[in-house]
Amino acid sequence: MDTESQYSGYSYKSGHSRSSRKHRDRRDRHRSKSRDGSRGDKSVTIQAPGEPLLDNESTRGDERDDNWGETTTVVTGTSEHSISHDDLTRIAKDMEDSVPLDCSRHLGVAAGAILALLSFLTPLAFLLLPPLLWREELEPCGTACEGLFISVAFKLLILLLGSWALFFRRPKASLPRVFVLRALLMVLVFLLVISYWLFYGVRILDARERSYQGVVQFAVSLVDALLFVHYLAVVLLELRQLQPQFTLKVVRSTDGASRFYNVGHLSIQRVAVWILEKYYHDFPVYNPALLNLPKSVLAKKVSGFKVYSLGEENSTNNSTGQSRAVIAAAARRRDNSHNEYYYEEAEHERRVRKRRARLVVAVEEAFTHIKRLQEEEQKNPREVMDPREAAQAIFASMARAMQKYLRTTKQQPYHTMESILQHLEFCITHDMTPKAFLERYLAAGPTIQYHKERWLAKQWTLVSEEPVTNGLKDGIVFLLKRQDFSLVVSTKKVPFFKLSEEFVDPKSHKFVMRLQSETSV
């Protein structure tokens, strides 16, 4: 008996060690595959500014009521530390994405600010240096020269406001590569300012120019040149992209939701940022629970046949003929999975309509109760109930119907009890109708409508065969990937339309109506 107990304990330990070794080997193979796959893709990363690198979906520690959630994690007596394959995938992805903070965005902003400050102070320095260095030798500034001071002041003010409005805006995303057009404009401004400084140093500072009016006109010319550069920046950065040149088709890889957009001349990385802006308010929220087929269809097993020849060698031909007949009969059998799927979908739609009707009735009764209380308070004034207390008071009457409806439509992960209470409080505060309250739950809304912890991805990966700084071309396809799904973007150029004119003589539509005495009009 002791021997048996020792043997059973040893077998349990060895089995546990073997399972742990298999778990470590499987984890190592998964990490190596994920690294190899990440090396094989030609991808760059677009990250939202000022946000951590870890995805919101990696934090699943939200506390909920026991009756409010559908799933429960059970820890058995033999599993002290449990982890799923999805957790391993998420951890590996987060470890690969947790890189040091990229300072390229701050470096670009700092370089632009320094260049703008240099460009703004250069005309002022041109005007102040001659009076400070050789005031006695300067010729007096006349009326025309003094009028140029006003011109310089207002032009610099316009340039300052225009530069602030165009360049110093809060960035929407951290681009993986340099914005080529903006970099070219910065280089152009730098060369312009350096050229003016070289000319000013050689022809004015060294020669000690006595005509102060000429110095002022030189400063005015620099301000005019900077204004023209600013106008060029407006054309290249803002106006050039307004004319539609390409049609983009954006498809979500998991459920096939698609949208079409028209864009102008933009680089691939700027188009990617623009598509993400459109995605959050045009696409319905991504719900992975809606992608699964009914359990009855998935659990259906296709029956198969195995034919064995148990006779002698003489009966080989007979057994072969019988096996062929059996296999042919099995092939002719029709699979009824589509019928089961059809009836499952019909039953689901019936259940949704039933839950929806109960929810609508419950909400109508709750709002009717609120109106009745408001009328009674007007007749008999007493302690007034604030919207939060009113929402908590009527939520109990609709909570069960709401919970069943959200569970049936698989929207429960996107609507917590607190969010429903806040929305109900908002509707009561603004005297909204029951239909306005139910609008959020009866149909899937845009992604941005829901709480950020449910949908916002801090990091997207742009996968493209072309350099992301290149402009759009006909036939270009690129991907915007995140952990759960990806957006596939295909590009088509807007076709060229040729119109012809056909002139219609207005006289060709005229006719003469001759009336006779017998004609009745």
Curated annotation (Swiss-Prot):
Sorted UniProt keywords: Cell membrane, Developmental protein, Disease variant, Membrane, Transmembrane, Transmembrane helix
Compositional bias per record (Basic and acidic residues), positions renumbered to this chain: 57-67
Expression sites (tissue/organ): Primarily expressed in the brain and epididymis. Not detected in the cochlea of Lp mice.
Biased composition (Basic residues): 15-33
GO biological process assignments: anterior/posterior pattern specification; apical protein localization; branching involved in blood vessel morphogenesis; cardiac vascular smooth muscle cell differentiation; cell migration involved in kidney development; cochlea development; cochlea morphogenesis; convergent extension involved in axis elongation
Side Extracellular, residues: 130-147, 200-217
Compositionally biased residues, Low complexity: 69-81
Annotated segments matching region Disordered: 1-81
Main location as per UniProt: membrane
Keyword Transmembrane helix tagged: yes
Disorder named in the UniProt entry: Defects in Vangl2 are a cause of the loop-tail (Lp) mutant phenotype. Heterozygous Lp mice exhibit a characteristic looped tail, while homozygous embryos show a completely open neural tube in the hindbrain and spinal region, a condition similar to the severe craniorachischisis defect in humans. Homozygotes also have complex cardiovascular defects including double-outlet right ventricle, perimembranous ventricular defects, double-sided aortic arch and associated abnormalities in the aortic arch arteries.
Role summary: Involved in the control of early morphogenesis and patterning of both axial midline structures and the development of neural plate. Plays a role in the regulation of planar cell polarity, particularly in the orientation of stereociliary bundles in the cochlea. Required for polarization and movement of myocardializing cells in the outflow tract and seems to act via RHOA signaling to regulate this process. Required for cell surface localization of FZD3 and FZD6 in the inner ear.
Quaternary structure note: Homodimer and heterodimer with Vangl1. Interacts through its C-terminal region with the N-terminal half of DVL1, DVL2 and DVL3. The PDZ domain of DVL1, DVL2 and DVL3 is required for the interaction. Also interacts with the PDZ domains of MAGI3, SCRIB/SCRB1 and FZD3. Interacts with PRICKLE3.
The family this protein is said to belong to: Belongs to the Vang family.
Name assigned to this protein: Vang-like protein 2
Species annotation: Mus musculus (Mouse)
